[in-house]
Amino acid sequence: MAYRLLRALFRGLFRVTIDGVTDQFKHEKLIITPNHVSFLDGALLALFLPIKPVFAVYTSITDTWYMRWLKPYVDFVALDPTNPMAIKHLVRMVEQGRPVVIFPEGRITVTGSLMKIYDGAAFVAAKSGAAVVPIRLDGPEFTHFGRLQGVLKTRWFPKISIHVLPATTIPMPQAPRSRERRVLAGEHLHTIMMAARMATVPRETLFEALLSAQTRYGRFKPCIEDVSFKEDSYQTLLKKTLGVSRILQRFTVPGEHVGMLLPNATITAAAIFGASLRGRIPALLNYTSGAKGLQSAIIAASLKTIVTSRQFLEKGKLTHLPEQVNEVNWVYLEDLKDTVTLTDKLWILFHLCFPRRAMLPQQADGSALILFTSGSEGNPKGVVHSHASLLANVEQIRTIADFTPRDRFMSSLPLFHAFGLTVGLFTPLMTGSRVFLYPSPLHYRVVPELVYDRNCTVLFGTSTFLGNYARFAHPYDFARVRYVVAGAEKLAESTKQIWQDKFGIRILEGYGVTECAPVVAINVPMAAKVNTVGRILPGMEARLINVPGIAQGGRLQLRGPNIMRGYLRVENPGVLEQPSAENAQGELDANWYDTGDIVTLDEQGFCAIRGRVKRFAKLAGEMVSLESVEQLAISLSPEGQHAAAAKTDSAKGEALVLFTTDSEITRERLIKVARENGVPELAVPRDIRVVKALPLLGSGKPDFVTLGKMAQDPEMSV
């Protein structure tokens, strides 16, 4: 009777629903593993699960007054994590057919993300052979019974959902010692819990996700700031978004690809969301690619209109672009301010109250945004991402990293790059963090000063940028920073060392590609390993394809919710080329993406990048990584610029060429370093060419197409 009354009360107050695979509770041996977000979790499961389970509760909690009060109504067993006999007792209960609920995190989350996973539950599952049913609780964290006050906008009676995921098992890991088996089983359970979170992500468009964040964290919560030093709340950002969307629809049509040539600024964020909510697809253009690069993007994406700013073009010394690229209609934001009418203002005011009514009908799987590859190995390609793929990558990042509304991001990486867009804009907005948008990562003195001045806690950058920030920064500039993540290029040992020595900060290395929105793997405090780029993100499948001549590692191919919709190529304008990859049998598999990177994956799932397939040279039948050649030069001259290329050779098929800005580098010195590092002499180039500077792309990466031509033609210069 008491159960029925409480169930009716909870259902009335919290509108509790239970969904998913609800017939998963008939297994003979069963362990239920929910996430832990509030003090209500146990009561919710006891009231709404179709079975009467035993709750494994840590001894520190069983002695509290409310647990003593609940004892007559709920079965629970005290679990002492320091006592091995407690685990054996649980195993016996499971083997006797009692369904057991264990909260693997062991404590209520204080970040909104998964906390540390204790391996006890996993070891019980592996030892007993029980089915593991993950459960995802959504909603209790918003109540006053959670521990996220000040992180989320708490309320008295939020809607609560109980999602039941498909049952799985944890096989006993193969390891010589019991301790190692426990750890491996715990990692398996952590993977299951992360997958459960990814499986219950709502399918939304970018604009819907922004509105959800506003609801979650509060409409007046400050969220975004730029060099104007005027911080906007979610409400103010929404107002700007609606204003831009209203004006954009005058000279564009639904479904049109709209070019955007804009800096890192709040108005750019408003333009992206504004175009998206009215069914337009923003194409973020690389303003460092020059007229030729813009023309390639215009052809590939079939652009008719480019939105930009006169002030930006003047400050960036880009005023020549509209004159040289005259095949599109250039629209200037400054010219649009005076065109806002009273009708427009009333439309904006109405939709501030009812923002979802401003949206045109869209699907989460539909095209949301176009980015462009760097063009380091040919013409830039348009990469079309859906709303779902972009938001999936944000959720993957949120699943493994504990970003909260207490964090402040410094975002100086250009928004036209996937790294800057997803990590520097979408992730902070969707996690309730505040973000400072700065227009250039090249201001090595200014960026550290702003990190200090704005109390930033999260900084992302390339190895080159981070190294230069460290050289110019005061030792106290990064005192509040807790996450520094390097990506887009290999993290130099010198950069890693200076951050450790000068600031006491460990740089976490990650790996991504534009086609994956972009983050593929990342080291985080909970799971980090030196000389790797971290584990592949939850929700993604990875496979390695053998490459003839390369003994260590394989060609990385990926499938997952964050994979692009497809390419737009200059050779086939406006036609979407869907992703596919050749499997080990030589057959094309749809929805797989071939990264072209040679990687290794260890037994714990950590990924190490060995090089790109296209950046290997075949010398007398042996495959040599051009990146390994560059690392030899970097060891000799950390401050210099170095890049390796291959040229045709009548004797060996191909020969190595090293381009360097350091005239002190010789073959003899390279051979000495190679021997010290166990690198074969075959990887030491005979052709060493000193240049004033390497040819670079707008992104700062070496232009390997030009370097390849220079390698073939000794007379050619930058």
From Swiss-Prot:
Disulfide bonds: none annotated. InterPro entries: Aas (IPR023775), AMP-bd_C (IPR025110), AMP-bd_C_sf (IPR045851), AMP-binding_CS (IPR020845), AMP-dep_synth/lig_dom (IPR000873), ANL_N_sf (IPR042099), Plipid/glycerol_acylTrfase (IPR002123). One of its GO terms (cellular component) is plasma membrane. CDD domains: LPLAT_AGPAT-like. Residues 233-646 are annotated as: AMP-binding. GO terms for biological process: phospholipid biosynthetic process. SUPFAM superfamilies: Acetyl-CoA synthetase-like, Glycerol-3-phosphate (1)-acyltransferase. Its EC number is 2.3.1.40, 6.2.1.20. GO terms for molecular function: acyl-[acyl-carrier-protein]-phospholipid O-acyltransferase activity; ATP binding; long-chain fatty acid [acyl-carrier-protein] ligase activity; long-chain fatty acid-CoA ligase activity. Keywords: Acyltransferase, ATP-binding, Cell inner membrane, Cell membrane, Ligase, Membrane, Multifunctional enzyme, Nucleotide-binding, Transferase, Transmembrane, Transmembrane helix. Its main location: membrane. The chain crosses the membrane at residues 258-277, 409-433. It catalyses: a 2-acyl-sn-glycero-3-phosphoethanolamine + a fatty acyl-[ACP] = a 1,2-diacyl-sn-glycero-3-phosphoethanolamine + holo-[ACP]; a long-chain fatty acid + holo-[ACP] + ATP = a long-chain fatty acyl-[ACP] + AMP + diphosphate. Residues 15-138 are annotated as: Acyltransferase. In the N-terminal section; belongs to the 2-acyl-GPE acetyltransferase family. In the C-terminal section; belongs to the ATP-dependent AMP-binding enzyme family. Plays a role in lysophospholipid acylation. Transfers fatty acids to the 1-position via an enzyme-bound acyl-ACP intermediate in the presence of ATP and magnesium. Its physiological function is to regenerate phosphatidylethanolamine from 2-acyl-glycero-3-phosphoethanolamine (2-acyl-GPE) formed by transacylation reactions or degradation by phospholipase A1. PANTHER family: ACYL-COA SYNTHETASE (PTHR43201), MEDIUM-CHAIN ACYL-COA LIGASE ACSF2, MITOCHONDRIAL (PTHR43201:SF5). This is Bifunctional protein Aas. It comes from Yersinia pestis. The gene is aas.
